[in-house]
Structures are given as structure tokens and as C-alpha cells.
From Swiss-Prot:
Monomer. Interaction with RNA polymerase subunits RpoF and RpoE is necessary for Tfe stimulatory transcription activity. Able to interact with Tbp and RNA polymerase in the absence of DNA promoter. Interacts both with the preinitiation and elongation complexes. Gene3D superfamilies: Winged helix-like DNA-binding domain superfamily/Winged helix DNA-binding domain. This is Transcription factor E. The winged helix domain is involved in binding to DNA in the preinitiation complex. Residues 7-91 form the HTH TFE/IIEalpha-type domain. Belongs to the TFE family. Transcription factor that plays a role in the activation of archaeal genes transcribed by RNA polymerase. Facilitates transcription initiation by enhancing TATA-box recognition by TATA-box-binding protein (Tbp), and transcription factor B (Tfb) and RNA polymerase recruitment. Not absolutely required for transcription in vitro, but particularly important in cases where Tbp or Tfb function is not optimal. It dynamically alters the nucleic acid-binding properties of RNA polymerases by stabilizing the initiation complex and destabilizing elongation complexes. GO terms for molecular function: DNA binding. Keywords: DNA-binding, Transcription, Transcription regulation. The gene is tfe. It comes from Nanoarchaeum equitans (strain Kin4-M).
Length: 139
């Protein structure tokens, strides 16, 4: 059974693959500072201001950060302080999409009416294991 650290590392890798490795560094820096301006965040992470802003706008759309206008500066405030929850929030739309993709496609045996998932159909080489009939996609 995977440890908590292994689970977080896996989620972190997935976020990095989807959003880029800069997202992880921006999140970690936000966790340390709670409220920070874009320029300081750019210096702390070593990424350009545009790269940092892209990450921040994505985090804002997901409800993880909000911006505060204070005098001439835009400050960014982290709304969620649990690293794993932040990763889960970022991965949620992709997990839903993944479930929808795998959940929609079924294969049916026209002879006996049994239904098979894509994985099962591939395993049986798209033939019904009961009667050998070629399976038909049902969408």
C-alpha cells in the first residue's frame, strides 16, 4: 500500500505533467508566504513574471488563490493551505474527464447481450468469451 508521501508525489507528478513544473514551485512558494506580490513570487521561484502570472491565473480560476489590489501592487493570497488538497483541486477536472471517457464506451455482444468495458473487450480480443461473437461498440 502506498504511503502518504508516495501518493502526494504521484499527484505532484501529475500536476507537473498537466500544468508544468513551474506550477509546483509557485504553489510551494505561496505556501511559505501566504500573501505575496507577483514580482516577489517571480524572484523566489526563478520564473519570469509572465510564467508566474499564468500559474496564478490558473490557481485563481480553481479558487485556490485570490488577488488583492493594495495601492500600486497586486498581492496574491493563498486560500487553501493543504498542499494535497491544492493538488487534488488542480487534478479534479482531469479526473472527471478521464472517468467520463472510460465510463461511456461499452462493448455489447449482439448475440447474448452481455456488456464489456473497453479493457475487458481488449482482453477478450473484442469477442464475447461466452459465444465468440464479435463485440459491437455501444456509445
Amino acid at each position: 500500500m502506498p504511503t502518504s508521501k508516495q501518493i502526494i508525489n504521484k499527484k505532484q507528478d501529475e500536476v507537473s505533467d498537466i500544468y508544468g513544473k513551474e506550477m509546483i514551485r509557485v504553489i510551494r512558494s505561496l505556501l511559505k508566504h501566504k500573501i505575496i506580490d507577483t514580482e516577489s513570487l517571480s524572484k523566489k521561484t526563478g520564473y519570469s513574471i509572465n510564467t508566474v502570472r499564468r500559474a496564478l491565473y490558473t490557481l485563481q480560476k480553481m479558487g485556490i488563490v485570490r488577488y488583492i489590489n493594495k495601492e500600486d501592487k497586486t498581492l496574491w493570497q493563498l486560500l487553501e493551505t493543504d498542499y494535497e488538497k491544492i493538488l487534488d483541486t488542480l487534478l479534479e477536472p482531469y479526473k472527471k474527464e478521464e472517468k467520463a471517457e472510460t465510463g461511456e464506451l461499452l462493448f455489447i455482444c449482439p448475440k447474448c447481450g452481455r456488456k464489456y468495458t473497453l479493457d475487458e473487450a481488449e482482453m477478450y480480443e473484442f469477442r464475447c468469451p461466452e459465444d465468440g461473437t464479435l463485440l459491437v461498440a455501444n456509445q
